UniProtKB/Swiss-Prot annotation:
InterPro entries according to UniProt: FliN-like_C, SpoA-like_sf, T3SS_OMP_SpaO, T3SS_SpaO/YscQ/SpaO
GO biological process per UniProt: bacterial-type flagellum-dependent swarming motility; positive chemotaxis; protein secretion by the type III secretion system
Organism encoding this protein: Salmonella typhimurium (strain LT2 / SGSC1412 / ATCC 700720)
Keyword Isomerase among record annotations: no
Name of encoding gene: spaO
Family: Belongs to the FliN/MopA/SpaO family.
Lineage, broadest ranks: Bacteria, Pseudomonadati, Pseudomonadota, Gammaproteobacteria, Enterobacterales
Nucleotidyltransferase keyword on record: no
Record function comment: Involved in a secretory pathway responsible for the surface presentation of determinants needed for the entry of Salmonella species into mammalian cells.
SUPFAM superfamilies in UniProt: Surface presentation of antigens (SPOA) (SSF101801)
The protein's name: Surface presentation of antigens protein SpaO
Pfam families found in the cross-reference section: FliMN_C
Amino acid sequence: MSLRVRQIDRREWLLAQTATECQRHGREATLEYPTRQGMWVRLSDAEKRWSAWIKPGDWLEHVSPALAGAAVSAGAEHLVVPWLAATERPFELPVPHLSCRRLCVENPVPGSALPEGKLLHIMSDRGGLWFEHLPELPAVGGGRPKMLRWPLRFVIGSSDTQRSLLGRIGIGDVLLIRTSRAEVYCYAKKLGHFNRVEGGIIVETLDIQHIEEENNTTETAETLPGLNQLPVKLEFVLYRKNVTLAELEAMGQQQLLSLPTNAELNVEIMANGVLLGNGELVQMNDTLGVEIHEWLSESGNGE
């Protein structure tokens, strides 16, 4: 099945965005096809960030109707073009975010040389401008979206194993945490470290500016003996929390974050990013581990 995708011309889209912004401020701006009659002159700034067309005859009539009548035989462009080139600021740009410090004036061309497609027509203090190219509008900050939240997970360690072992794991088994760590993650990004204290946890380091990518790769031989030897990374998640940006910033100030009651009894067991079960955080001899209370085996019967 083929999808019907509406095509958007970026040039016209930028013109339309500016038209909407101008209209919002009470200025008339329309996207339309210009007439191809008469002579036209293209203007642009020195950096070529924008370009627009003018019809010299219309401009001369707007500035001086008497001169416009006299210029019918001589050609209005022969009067307007030298004036534009010689004047430092010949007109006020009707689009506030555009610059007109140095104006580039091209030679007059017939209307047949106008570009295909619509142009943005806006009146300046000297006459009509037909914009062909415009830059993006300046970004306007709309403030922080207060409802936006980020999912954090507080990881207490991980272990590397193989697929064949998963089939032998059941309720009551203890999965040892081979690599103990106390790290805060948002999706695959490591944000920092935390300490477990009485009554909750405290985020000790939180560097949002230099977020690290989580390394989920497991060192294996170049070739695997079989599918049962595929690597599996077990991750043990003590707690999950969705936070706002303000809450995330507060965590970086070593604010105490309360854990839910009996958080140690509900540690999530993730395998390659998939939730397979949960259990209780225990210590077997000198090694932390998780005793499985719930386990989703490949057969789906939890055994």
